[in-house]
């Protein structure tokens, strides 16, 4: 059974995906993988160049240039 919250999240992601497609010309990738409602060059709501909500250049919530929450490079 798909919950209402899951449907809402999918709808929001779809809307952001379409907005990114219109802005960058290609859904999801555009400028440095900047789709899915990402801010700047982030993905999945990431801020800056991070992925999955990461801040800066980190991945998966990493802060700075680290990966998987790493700090530093």
From Swiss-Prot:
The modification Tyrosine amide is found at residues 29, 39, 47, 55, 63. The modification Tryptophan amide is found at residue 71. Induction: Upon D.coniospora and S.marcescens infection. Upon physical injury and osmotic stress. Transcriptionally regulated by the transcription factor sta-2 upon activation of the innate immune response to molting and injury to the adult epidermis. The lineage of its organism: Eukaryota, Metazoa, Ecdysozoa, Nematoda, Chromadorea. Residues 1-22 form the signal peptide. GO terms for biological process: defense response to bacterium; defense response to fungus; killing of cells of another organism; neuropeptide signaling pathway. It is found in: Secreted. This is Neuropeptide-like protein 29. Keywords: Amidation, Antibiotic, Antimicrobial, Cleavage on pair of basic residues, Fungicide, Neuropeptide, Repeat, Secreted, Signal. The keyword Secreted applies. The keyword rRNA-binding does not apply. GO terms for cellular component: extracellular space. Its main location: secreted. Antimicrobial peptides that have antibacterial activity against the Gram-negative bacteria S.marcescens. Has antifungal activity against D.coniospora. May play a role in response to physical injury and osmotic stress. Through the neuropeptide receptor nlp-29, induces sleep upon activation of the innate immune response to molting and injury to the adult epidermis. Weakly or not expressed in absence of infection. Upon infection by D.coniospora, it is expressed in hypoderm. Also expressed in perivulval cells when D.coniospora spores adhere to this region. Expressed in hypodermis upon physical injury. Belongs to the YARP (YGGW-amide related peptide) family. It comes from Caenorhabditis elegans. One of its GO terms (molecular function) is neuropeptide receptor binding.
